[in-house]
């Protein structure tokens, strides 16, 4: 201790006792602190907890909330962009104008000769009517048998000759293929069923009109006929024919026993109608640019055949399909065939209708008086039937020339304004 005090005394001069005491206390405290820093002694906690089980408690730090004034910004107002509207002139295009489809008008008109059939010994176009200025054409009738002598074999010489005569005279032809009793006899050998009856005192036969073999061969013939002549300029009209009593008209002039036999052979209205429509289609197809017509008669006192057949033709072929009355007289139109007269008037409004005089003034067969002939011609004019077949005997009768000429002038005047 002495040594220490001497060292202190020697190195630290004090001015008085108070300074010396303060220095001593500082040294003591420094020594204690140095001892407390050793590894074996516990640290001195100047603020020990009051109880070892108490958890330290700290006062929460309370801070005033930071209040910031909301940032208020003036809305950005932009003027709308106004652009002038783009005005474009409308595109104006000329409308597409298409010409309407106009169905051809088939003016089947004029004075035609109801001349005799063409055969090996007779010509429909003959010298009796050679120099008649009012004559517009000739009915040329040729039998199917003459033009189709064997199955698949055709002889066109008869018709070629008539066309040659027509060309020389610059006249027209109304063509009719005689069927029925004028059908080829070889049809029976090919299997067609034939029906016998009496015509003008002669026993003849015709193929049953609904027979499949008959229809097949007749259709084949019509097709060949059209292939050869459909474009011929001298053929003005084609009469459609079927297997009937006289091979030209629609009727069957059977007696009661023959009617019974015909029905026993299978006749029904439906079968006959189907036969007619099949043949109409064949002719219309074979002659696509020619007017065609069918003669109308009651069949066994029924109008159904004629009505249905005509409706079929009009529906499919329109203005190209017409009708013919081969019974024409004023008396027949107003008293006998009134329903057929009605059909003619109906068809005339839609296409065309023609007449063939039932008789002649100049012959003893189906005789007419001159007054009856004049009345028949006038009735046809009054109803718009401007196609007329007049018997060649009357055409060659000079006493009737003025009557027939005046009638033909009326036809020309009426058709000129259509």
Enumerate the language-model features and the residues they cover.
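Catalytic domains of carbohydrate-active enzymes, especially glycoside hydrolases
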Residues: 111, 115-146, 172-174, 285, ...
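Aromatic-lined carbohydrate-recognition surfaces of secreted/lumenal glycan-active proteins
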Residues: 116, 234-245, 268-305, 323-328
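Aromatic-lined substrate-binding rim segments of carbohydrate-active enzymes
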Residues: 131-198, 269-275, 279-282, 376
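The substrate-binding groove and active-site-proximal loops of carbohydrate-active enzymes
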Residues: 143-156, 203-216, 265-270, 363-366
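An active-site-proximal structural segment forming one wall of the substrate-binding cleft
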Residues: 162-167, 202-240, 275, 279-282
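Substrate-binding cleft of secreted/luminal carbohydrate-active enzymes
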Residues: 174, 178, 319-418
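Aromatic- and acidic-residue-enriched segments that line the glycan-binding/catalytic groove
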Residues: 181-201, 243-263
